Regions:
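Short, well-ordered secondary-structure micro-motifs within conserved domains or adaptor modules
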Residues: 34-63, 69-72, 190-196
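N-terminal pre-catalytic "stem/leader" segment of glycosyltransferase-like enzymes
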Residues: 1-50, 55, 136-137, 261-270
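Short, solvent-exposed loop/turn segments at secondary-structure junctions
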Residues: 9-11, 51-53, 74-77, 133-137, ...
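Catalytic donor nucleotide-activated moiety binding site of glycosyltransferases and closely related
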Residues: 6-10, 131-132, 136, 145-183
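Donor nucleotide-activated moiety binding/catalytic core segment of transferases
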Residues: 33-39, 155, 163-211, 217
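Leloir-type glycosyltransferase catalytic cores
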Residues: 81-125, 221-270
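A short, gly/pro- and small-residue-rich
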Residues: 52-80, 148-149, 206-220
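A short, charged/proline- and glycine-enriched loop
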Residues: 1-4, 121-134
Length: 270
């Protein structure tokens, strides 16, 4: 049995792109409950983002060591509200975590669809670019004061300027479409990016910029976690990691037609 905690009070939520497809393709029997009402989740649950009571329920499942699935925005191929099609945007699918793990030996094919170029690092940047995640993520990490605390920690190890880039928000949504200044612009002279779990880590790595992140970040396998290394950051070739990310995010069409289930089974996630 898979129990989906869904936003019954918002029939226009993009969560339904995931859940309607899961209902058609998932190998388990499905039941749906209201994420704005339920507070005591059962094992083998599925969530979309930290809406309703999702964050509190995910924390309870983790404390009990119970299985759950978490779906949310992708690492690349994010939706465009002005051009929504079932095959032109993606959702990440994670098991027992809010971000995906690093899967070795994934093929390049799914990543190559995005035509993203990867630059070699030149370590010529000037400032530290701090990219906080959302308040909801920081509360999930039990680090509600992450931004102020991380800036104070950075100052212990470097006298480089610090540039703060908050998650863009507006028009009832968040992400690149609402940014007044593109992330690519802020990365041009960045020495490194410091984030908790922001997807900004993907663009930074593709631009050849080292990343510092939280232990629960999807970038932990290619990034740095100790700020004491900020003047001597590690940067490794991100290609295999990017291939892994691409194999753990799916279009609404792929979720509905069984492609997502097939890949998750092949990778022994499902």
């Amino acid at each position: 049995m898979l129990t989906i905690y869904a936003p019954f009070n918002n029939k226009n939520s993009k969560a339904w792109e995931v859940f309607n497809g899961v209902e058609k393709s998932w190998p388990d029997q499905i039941t749906k409950l209201d994420n704005a009402v339920e507070t005591d989740p059962v094992s083998n649950s599925m969530f979309w983002g930290f809406v309703g009571n999702n964050r509190e329920m995910v924390k309870k499942l983790e404390a009990r060591n119970h299985n759950y699935w978490f779906t949310d925005t992708p690492y690349f191929g994010r939706f465009d509200n002005s051009n929504l099609k079932p095959d032109n945007h993606y959702w990440r699918v994670c098991k027992n975590a809010i971000h995906v793990p690093y899967l070795k030996d994934c093929k390049a094919d799914r990543f190559e669809k995005f035509g993203m170029k990867i630059k070699a690092p030149n370590f010529a940047g000037k400032y530290i670019l701090v990219c906080p995640s959302s308040t909801g993520i920081h509360n999930y990490l039990d680090k509600p004061n992450w931004t102020n605390e991380i800036i104070e920690q950075i100052k212990r190890y470097t006298d480089r300027p610090i540039k703060l880039r908050h998650k863009p928000r507006g028009k009832g949504t968040s992400g690149p479409s609402e940014a007044k200044v593109p992330l690519s612009e802020d990365l041009k002279e960045a020495w490194c990016v410091v984030t908790s779990c922001s997807i900004a880590a993907v663009e930074a790595m593709c631009e050849g910029i080292p990343v510092f992140c939280d232990h629960k970040s999807f970038a932990v396998d290619v990034g740095n976690v100790e700020l004491s290394d900020i003047e001597n950051p590690y940067y490794g070739g991100p290609e295999p990691w990017l291939y892994s990310l691409a194999y753990q995010q799916f279009t609404p069409e792929e979720i509905q037609n069984g492609t997502a289930v097939e890949i998750l089974m092949d990778k022994e996630i499902l």
